[in-house]
Amino acid sequence: MMMTKQKPTLTERLNIGGDEVRELKLGATFNPKNTATAFHTIKYDFKPASVDTSRMATVDVGSNNQVTVTVPNLESSGVPQTVYKGNHKKYTKECLIIFDKETGAITLEKLNHNIQVKKTRSEMTNKPSLMPATNAAPMSSGPNGVPMPSGAMAGTGSGPKLENSTMRITSKTKVSTGSRRNNIIDFKPRNSPMQQSSPSRPVASHRSPQSAPAWHANNAQQTLPSIPMIMDDDDFGLSAALHNGGGGGGGQANISGSSTGSSVGQPDYGSVNMGKQRQASSQGHAKRQQQTQRSSPPMQQQQQQQNYGRGGANNNYAQQLHQQQQQQQQQQLQQQQQQMQQRASFSHSNHSNSMPLDLDSPTHHEQAAQSMAQAAAVLEQQIGGELSASSSSSESESSDSDSGSDSDDSTEDDRSTHQQQQPPGQLSQHHHHHMQQQQHMHQLPNLGLGSISPTYNSHQHHQQQQQQHQQQQQQQSHHHHHQQQQQQSSIYASNGGFPNDLLQNDLQLSSNSSDDDD
């Protein structure tokens, strides 16, 4: 059977045994005049085992019935003391019995105040960490709203440690919270619109409206397309003018086509050679334009790159520098083109001035035709005078019929011979005139293919072309003079230097006069 331990009774604890009657005495608290003796009760919610009962505790009563109880602890516990806080209430009907073991007297006393205290929460949190109890005391004073009494801690000597430890803990918490706030503050201005629009940041300065629209509006969109567009317009205008003037007047079309590159007095074949040179120069210029377009993309592609790459301001700045470099290159190309045009015009003008006699221009044709017409008019006048004289002589000799018949026979024979001689001259004239028209017609389409774009060839190549051009001009001029001599020889007859058509008219008049006489 199990033995259960029974609690000792009050008589056993007080060692009061038997049926004895004891006297109960009233204490001094029942005396209304008593002011020195008072009894109070203290109720704890939690009492640690480390309380040192051999030392005295302190009770501090403050205002508004606030009471602070400080109980010392054992030295081995690591916590110097335990602090309780609470309030007190006055008793009205409660009493207590005091039993004296030595004398055996029993005294009844009134209770004055009931004190109910609670252990501070800082002691519970700091006890396992073996830190002094004073370290965490101010932390509990904050949420409770009750300041720590300085009088209770004055005798212990742990007051300064309490304040320093609490300040260290609070400073750590402040640093942690302060660093978080600083990070948030630093993070917000980076994404805020005020920092992006401020002029001090380089990103905002690259996005300013003073740089980008100025280059796009004035320079980039005008300089890039200006070089090919100007040259293409001039080429189309020249080719249209040459093709329109090719059917009517070949000389005027050739003059208008070659007036921009050289003087007006150049011949047709000179303009043909110039057209060939211009074709070669235009092909070279087109190749150079293709290379430049491949090396440097057009402005539209750069704008698309800018639109797709607006996230980085450094890309915009690099693109602007690239645009400036392209514009400088284009200005240099324009200056080189102007210099080449000046050189070409100067060389062509010198060439046209140095060889004015060997060239066969349309004005030279017109002057030759006018001189031939004047010479023919003078010859007609001379022949008219001689015909009048011959007609008078034929009338005087009309009496002789035999001579008239002989003259008729002779005139008929002469007429037949002159008619036989006449067609080769006329055919040669028509053939020569037809050949000149064919030359003009063949020269006009070749001129339409030319252009006045400046050549990028070397100066030596240009001199070689000029030498070949001079040799061709000399050969063609000799050929043309030879044709003129043949034409003049075919026009003038061998008898008296009169043309065949004039002699034919003379013979017809003489035959008519002889018929009238008969």
UniProtKB/Swiss-Prot annotation:
In what ranges is there compositional bias, type Low complexity?
A: 289-342, 368-377, 418-428, 463-476, 500-518
Which ranges are annotated Acidic residues under compositional bias? Answer: 397-412
Organism whose genome encodes this protein: Drosophila mojavensis (Fruit fly)
Protein's job: Promotes transcriptional elongation by Su(Tpl)/ELL. Essential for development.
Q: Which domain of life is it from?
A: Eukaryota
Q: Where is the composition biased (Polar residues)?
A: 119-128, 163-182, 253-265, 274-284, 343-355
Q: Which residues carry this modification: Phosphoserine?
A: S192
The answer to whether keyword Transcription applies is yes
Q: What are the record keywords, sorted?
A: Activator, Developmental protein, Nucleus, Phosphoprotein, Transcription, Transcription regulation
User: Could you identify this protein by its name?
Assistant: Ell-associated factor Eaf
Which cellular compartments is it found in?
Answer: Nucleus
Mind giving the lineage of the organism this protein is from? Answer: Eukaryota, Metazoa, Ecdysozoa, Arthropoda, Hexapoda
Region Disordered, annotated ranges: 119-216, 241-518
User: Which GO molecular function annotations are given, in alphabetical order?
Assistant: transcription elongation factor activity
Q: Which GO terms describe its biological process?
A: cellular response to heat; positive regulation of DNA-templated transcription; transcription elongation by RNA polymerase II
Cross-referenced InterPro entries:
EAF_fam, Tscrpt_elong_fac_Eaf_N
Gene Ontology CC: nucleoplasm; super elongation complex
Q: Which family does it belong to?
A: Belongs to the EAF family.
